[in-house]
Structure formats: C-alpha cells, structure tokens
Amino acid sequence: MASSFNSLAPQIDLPQTEHQILSFWETQDIFQKSVAAREGKPTWTFYEGPPTANGKPGTHHIEARVFKDVFPRYQTMKGLQVIRKAGWDCHGLPVEIAVEKELGFSGKGDIENYGIAPFNEKCKASVQEHVGEFTNMTRRMGFWVDFDEAYWTMSGEYVESVWWSLKEIWNKGLLVQDYRVAPYCPRCGTGLSDHELSQGYESVVDPSVYVKFPATSGKAGELG
C-alpha cells in the first residue's frame, strides 16, 4: 500500500529533518493557513505572557514555550480557530539594569547625568536587539505564534490602553487607596515588585555582632 509520507533513512539526521519541516511550514504559510481554515469556528484565543527582552533567551524560556505551544495546538486539533498573539515585555528594572551595566553606570545619578531621554532610547535599542534573538529561538523550536501582530509594552498604543483600563476601573469605584509595605531598592532609587525582589536573593554568611553598653541607672546600674 502506497504511503503519502516520505520514508526516513535508517541513519536519520534529525536536525536536518527539523530544518526541512520548519522551512516547509514557513514557505507554505502552514501556521497562517491553520488559522484561516477554521474561520467561523469557535475561537480559543492565546495572548502570550511576554518574556522580558533584557538578555539572550535561556533553556527556561524553551520550557515555557513548549507549554505555550502544546495547548494551542491541541485546541487547533479539536477544530477551534486559535488566535495566537506574541508579546514582548519591554519595561522594568531588568532592562534598565542591563543597560546600566553596558554603560558602566553604578546608580540612578549616572542615569540622570546621562539624560533620561537618551537612556530610554538605549533601553529601546537593547530590547529590539534581544527580541530578534528570541524570535530566532522561537522559530527554531517550532513554536507557532503571530509575530506580525505582536504587542509591545513600550508602544504608545499599549501604554494608552493600560491607562484607559485603569481609568475605567477608577470610574467604577474599584480602586482602593490603602497602605502597603513595599520593598525598595536604594541603589536603583525605586520600588520593587515581589518578583524583582526574589531575583536578588542569595545565601550569605555574616558575623553576628554583639555590643555591650554600661548600665548607668536602674537595678542593673546598682550592680555596677
């Protein structure tokens, strides 16, 4: 019986086969066709929880992307139209600290002397560079996601949408003003999220220091 699948050589070159499949997917627009073919079907929407583009991708990013790819593929196989939007987290201390290290800065004062506007531009350029590396890694591992319509947290449109959402919540009386103990970084001169605080955790060994002071009054003072 004839098979529609190509036979594999006994000594298969897996990386070469992967590249052939990836090339076929890209040249034939297989991902886009898988979405278009289910037009009118019930939708299952996936917005990627964006990675922070402050450095080169690591193995933990691959692990997370496996889960982000498996579930949309499963829903696609069930016949749903799966919209998959990529995203890039461009803000936060990780990006700023990476640029500070690149420029040899040691604190907030160096940024102010350098200039807020040019520092922001350096941060944007750094994000753009690392996004390219993330994109290459994502395509190499076969993760299907729409990069053409990706959202960027540093875009004016995205920032305005966040302010709009906050205003809507305020108008509905859902914002509460209260006190909260928040971590603060004296070097960076800014508050920290719980996630950012946990990134700086390390085990250290410090001496225990005991200081004795003479008692000058009370029963302890009477004892000399």
Give residue spans per PLM region:
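N-terminal, positively charged nucleic-acid-binding surface of large information/translation enzymes
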Residues: A2-G224
